[in-house]
Amino acid sequence: MDNNMKYYEAYEERYKTVHQKGISWASDKSTPIVMDIIRRYYIKPEYELLEIGCGEGRDSKAVLDEGYHLTATDISAEAISYSQKHMPEYAQHFRVLDCLSCDLDSSFDYIYAVAVLHMLVPEEDRNGFYHFIHDHLKSEGIALICTMGDGKTEIQSDISKAFELQERDHPFASALTSSVTIPMTSLLIHGFMTDASIG
């Protein structure tokens, strides 16, 4: 393990570990709200879409199968390689990206991130995530940030233990390590308008 790796890069090792066992990290069932938002806001196939934290591509596949122009990104090279191998017809749509330290030359009509924000623990990293989305979203664009939590309880992971692999018992080899509540005010502070009717 590289001592210079950031805590949120621990998923690289987790993906490698489960893939070496011939299993996937998550189920292949897509997150319904991703396509629900596309339909609700009349996002057209020719629009530019960005997925942050695509993992093994479960949501990417659903979007790409519908003919949308999607760039699917993840910080994990292992996850991107897995997605390209399992969806060779869409391989060119997947790329490695650390949205906290890299930039893209494009802007997007729809940016979505499912189960990403809870992995960014310090406030400065969450702020960097919001800034990346704000900087890459077209002026009339739509952003979907879908995270874990019950809306009341906030649990903060110990980032010093991010690289400690833990034995987990779960049906799809998919367990996420922390759960957070995102106050709407933090989205408003970063220049986002919110739609509280989604749910």
Enumerate the language-model features and the residues they cover.
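Class I (Rossmann-like) S-adenosyl-L-methionine-dependent methyltransferase catalytic domain
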Residues: 1-45, 49-103, 142-199
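A conserved beta-strand element that flanks and buttresses the S-adenosyl-L-methionine
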Residues: 112
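Short catalytic micro-motifs in class I SAM-dependent methyltransferases
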Residues: 115-119
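Conserved catalytic-core motifs of eukaryotic protein kinase domains, centered on the activation segment
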Residues: 122-124
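A short glycine-rich, Lys/Arg-flanked "PGG" loop and its adjoining helix->strand segment in the class I
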Residues: 127-139
